[in-house]
Structures are given as structure tokens and as C-alpha cells.
Design a protein with these regions (language model features):
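Tandem CBS (Cystathionine beta-synthase) repeat/Bateman regulatory domains
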Residues: 1-164
Length: 164
């Protein structure tokens, strides 16, 4: 009985990844938020995405998030429609008024949103301003890191209880 209580207390030292917040992920990523304006060309947006190895850019006008442009938007609204990206504007193909989250959202809440809505990116808003963007990759990385930590804690507990 004592061991199970000890295991529970050892594992409670760190919150689970599903309890980790978006804010903690953003702090680990750093505070750089790439963005683009609605009057930029799609070509400029794609160039920025390629240069920065990202799949989406928040679209900001006068400091306010007005949309998001993704690789998926480009594929569906430019390539499949036979349009020319050097002349298309971001505002013409962006997803307007995207679903947003706050730094207080948990990883599990975000995973539910991206799974149910089939999103890959969630802009993060704090006090009315864009403060970051979370990708499905960020969420998965948080879960994997937490699982690795849990495994390490269990291995330490087990090996401490039994001589090698």
C-alpha cells in the first residue's frame, strides 16, 4: 500500500502533458511569432513559410488577428483552382476569423480541437493580441516529453526498490 502512494506522489511532481498549458509550450518555443499582412501576395506568404519551415502564418492587420493562411489553403484555393500565386493576395485565400485559444488552454483541450476540427495550427491570443501559434507537432511533442518523463520516473522507482 505504501508503494502505490509513493508512486502516485513521485509521479505527481510534474503535471501530465494533458495538463500542461499552451503558455508553457510557448515559453519553451520562444516568443517569436511569424505573421503576414492580408495585402501581401500568396507567393510572399509561401516564401516566408518555406524560409521558416512553418506550415501556417497568422494574418494580422493593425495588430489584430484577421485570419490564418496555411499550406492547405494554398493547395485548395490556388493550386486546385488553377490560380497564379504571384498575383493572388493573402486575404483572398486565408481562413478568416480562425479558431483561437489562450495560453491557459491545456494540451488535451487543444488536441480535442485539432482532432475534431481537423486543424493543424491554433493561433494563441492573450488580451486581444496574437502571442503565438501552436501546431499539432507542438502538442504531440508535449505528450511525448511527458511520457518519457513518466517512464523515467517509473524506472527510477522500480530500480530503487529492487537490487540489480
Amino acid at each position: 500500500m505504501t508503494k502505490s502512494v509513493h508512486v502516485a506522489s513521485a509521479l505527481s511532481v510534474r503535471k501530465t502533458a494533458t495538463e500542461d498549458t499552451v503558455g508553457s509550450i510557448l515559453r519553451a518555443k520562444g516568443n517569436q511569432v511569424w505573421q503576414i499582412g492580408p495585402s501581401a501576395t500568396v507567393y510572399e506568404a509561401l516564401s516566408q513559410m518555406a524560409e521558416r519551415s512553418v506550415g501556417a502564418l497568422p494574418v494580422v492587420s493593425d495588430g489584430v488577428l484577421v485570419g490564418i493562411i496555411t499550406e492547405r489553403d494554398y493547395a485548395r484555393k490556388v493550386v486546385l483552382q488553377g490560380r497564379s500565386s504571384p498575383h493572388a493576395l493573402v486575404r483572398e485565400i486565408m481562413t478568416p476569423s480562425p479558431v483561437t485559444i489562450t495560453p491557459e488552454f491545456t494540451v488535451m483541450q487543444c488536441l480535442r480541437i485539432v482532432s475534431m476540427r481537423r486543424f493543424r495550427h491554433l493561433p494563441v491570443i492573450e488580451e486581444g493580441r496574437l502571442c503565438g501559434i501552436i501546431s499539432i507537432g507542438d502538442l504531440v511533442a508535449a505528450v511525448i516529453a511527458n511520457q518519457a518523463f513518466t517512464i523515467e520516473q517509473l524506472e527510477t522507482y522500480i530500480s530503487a526498490g529492487y537490487p540489480a
